[in-house]
Amino acid sequence: MSMTDPIADLLVRIKNAAAVGKQTVKLPSSKIKVAIAQVLKDEGYITDLRVTQTENNKAELEIVLKYFEGRPVIETLKRFSRSGLRQYRGKTELPKVLGGLGIAIISTSKGIMTDAQAREAGVGGEVLCFVA
């Protein structure tokens, strides 16, 4: 079965798993999903990520969620740019999430990074999602 929006699938799986208190999330892996998960790990929103091979040679991404005092660290996870309406922003138009308390994940020509890293690198790109 083909997936229309794999990034939205990743975000929804993380959001649903955190809502019910699961420790890990397993989903089909891709380069962009691993890159987004790596940004979440670098920013402290998740504990760990692993890419493993299943029996039928498919790559599987396992994300270990992070909790603080019994509550998920990720409170808000929202897809911004979507397959039907891509949202591109220049380096001066990159959004700040919750006045700088959250992050926006941006797909740039230099890879996937946070809004702060994109501003520092002086590049714009597609605003994939918001995390807070």
Swiss-Prot record:
PROSITE patterns named among the record's database cross-references: RIBOSOMAL_S8
One Gene Ontology term, aspect cellular component: ribosome
Domain of life: Bacteria
Molecular function in Gene Ontology: rRNA binding; structural constituent of ribosome
Keywords: Ribonucleoprotein, Ribosomal protein, RNA-binding, rRNA-binding
Transmembrane segments: none
The keyword Ribonucleoprotein is assigned to this record: yes
Ribonucleoprotein among keywords: yes
BP GO terms, sorted: translation
Family named by the database record: Belongs to the universal ribosomal protein uS8 family.
Biological role stated in the UniProt entry: One of the primary rRNA binding proteins, it binds directly to 16S rRNA central domain where it helps coordinate assembly of the platform of the 30S subunit.
Subunit details: Part of the 30S ribosomal subunit. Contacts proteins S5 and S12.
Identification of the protein by name: Small ribosomal subunit protein uS8
Organism whose genome encodes this protein: Xanthomonas euvesicatoria pv. vesicatoria (strain 85-10) (Xanthomonas campestris pv. vesicatoria)
Protein's gene: rpsH
